[in-house]
A protein has these predicted regions:
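Non-catalytic helical/linker scaffolds that mediate oligomerization, partner binding
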Residues: 1-477
């Protein structure tokens, strides 16, 4: 049995609440597997500090902790509102003008994006996370639109806008994003999360940029727009284009409706497992812990449901970035994960065995089936690229996976995958008993109480050859 036996992983957002080396270390010790750096806020100098702290904490704990760069994307916000307060009621008309820099108290509001270039008459526009709903009634000028308000509310400075029916025409990577991507390429982030994507083409564009910069970061596509979930086929195309998916439920609920979120979440988790892609469930999972030391019962059920559905990871946002109880939130999430995984089993799913990863998937299926039939304690996987480990993970085995690799980058990028614990070491021809013994000595594998042996299924192949996985062994040590 592995000491790292938390199958569903925890992704935590770094922010002011944990902006010290000591707090980052506490996050990692509490059970965080990946740290999210939100590039909507903060300076590059702050990012460099955080990266150094995360790597130091991971080294101290003796395990891989991944780092995710979350791009802001075309997040559209209002400008500064006079007195930070403007009341509206049904029937009111507002003019949102990109050319306006200062609000004078009238219905002419500054906005940080030229909506006139993208929006059409009749399209909805939601203000302040959907709290105020309106519809475009006129394109007033080359920089301004007029909207009619549908409900009462208060408009405040720099609140976000959602445009659920507006086509951005592939223009989802902003100038700020480009600068951040270039910065990230020099910092070797493990993952880059892409915001507000609308199609698989958006993912491919980011892929081309990363390749041109020499970055090997994996792409996490954030599913949060109405257009991204228009059809099952569109969702599947995005899943196939990306390396992973983040179910970003906040903006998705605003754009598509609250009732849509649970079904889309379930579909995306299934699609990711089918295609061997990472799936992260995010947004307000333990939201009440921003202000309270314990979660609500509904939040506990929310986290447990994501675990039961087979998500690779669950994410904490404001809970760790700005909350009063960041470390407690991680501990609570870990406790929920452990209890749920020990009292439930993720339903099996058929992986795609016709695509380019069919060999990996077939070997993975055989290894997991064998491990469960003989009640193995652990699956040990030697992997050069990480592909075999990901395929085994997608099968959602009810036991830990120790992924042995000589590639530090691969070890780090596997940190978020379901049930995976990375063990970095050079490959050798002499695998099997010696490898399992080494894992026991290093503390990665422990015997069960009352037993003196470990039963392991070992998946391996030709050393340092990508695509060479072809051998399954059973070893009792």
């Amino acid at each position: 049995m592995s000491k790292l036996y938390k199958r569903t992983k925890i992704l935590a957002t770094v922010g002011p609440a944990v902006f010290t080396e000591e707090k980052i270390a506490e996050l990692v010790m509490a059970g965080v597997n990946c740290c999210r750096l939100n590039f909507s806020h903060g300076s590059y100098e702050e990012r460099d500090e955080q990266i150094a702290w995360i790597k130091k904490a991971a080294e101290k704990k003796g395990r891989s902790v991944a780092i995710l760069q979350d791009l802001q994307g075309p997040k559209i916000r209002l400008g500064v509102i006079k007195d930070n307060h403007y009341e509206v009621k049904p029937g009111d008309e507002l003019i949102l003008d990109y050319a306006v820099t200062e609000h004078d108290g009238s219905n002419l509001l500054p906005v940080q994006y030229n909506l006139a270039e993208r929006m059409k008459v009749g399209e909805p526009l939601f203000i302040f996370d959907g709290k105020i709903r309106s519809t475009v009634t006129e394109i007033v000028s080359s920089t301004a639109i007029k909207v009619k308000v549908e409900n009462e509310g208060t408009i405040m400075s720099r609140k976000g806008l959602n445009l659920p029916d507006t086509d951005f025409g592939g223009d989802v990577i902003t100038e700020k994003d480009m600068a951040d991507i270039e910065f990230g390429a020099t910092r070797d982030f493990d993952y880059v999360a892409m915001s507000f994507i609308q199609s698989a083409d958006d993912v491919e564009r980011l892929r081309q940029i990363l390749v041109s910069l020499g970055s090997t970061a994996q792409i996490i596509a954030k599913i949060e727009t109405k257009k991204a979930i228009e059809t099952d086929e569109k969702m599947e195309a995005i899943v196939q284009a990306a390396d992973g998916i983040m179910v970003a439920r906040g903006d998705m609920a605003v754009e598509a409706g609250n009732e849509v979120v649970p079904i889309v979440q379930r579909k995306l988790i299934s699609l990711c497992r089918k295609h061997g892609k990472l799936c992260v469930v995010a947004t307000q999972m333990l939201g009440s812990m921003v202000d309270n030391p314990s979660p609500s019962r509904a939040e506990v059920s929310d986290v447990a449901n994501a675990v039961i559905q087979g998500a690779d990871a669950v994410m904490l946002s404001d809970e760790t970035a700005n909350g009063k109880y960041p470390i407690e939130a991680v501990k609570q999430m870990k406790q929920i994960i452990l209890y749920t995984q020990n009292h439930s089993k993720v339903d099996p799913i058929d992986q795609d065995v016709t695509g380019e990863n069919r060999e990996y998937n077939a070997v993975a299926n055989a290894a997991v089936s064998l491990a469960e039939k003989i009640h193995a304690d652990v699956i040990v996987c030697e992997t050069a690229s990480g592909a075999t480990a990901v395929s085994i993970s997608a099968e959602r085995p009810n036991l830990p996976i120790i992924s042995v690799t000589s590639n530090k980058r691969v070890a780090s990028q596997l940190a978020l995958n379901y049930a995976n614990a990375s063990f970095e070491r050079p490959f050798s021809e002499n695998y099997g008993i010696d490898l399992v013994q080494e894992l026991k000595v290093s503390g990665y594998i422990n015997t069960k109480p009352g037993e003196d042996k470990v039963l392991a299924v070992i998946v391996s192949g030709q050393p340092n050859v990508i695509g060479g996985t072809d051998t399954i062994q059973i070893r009792s040590i």
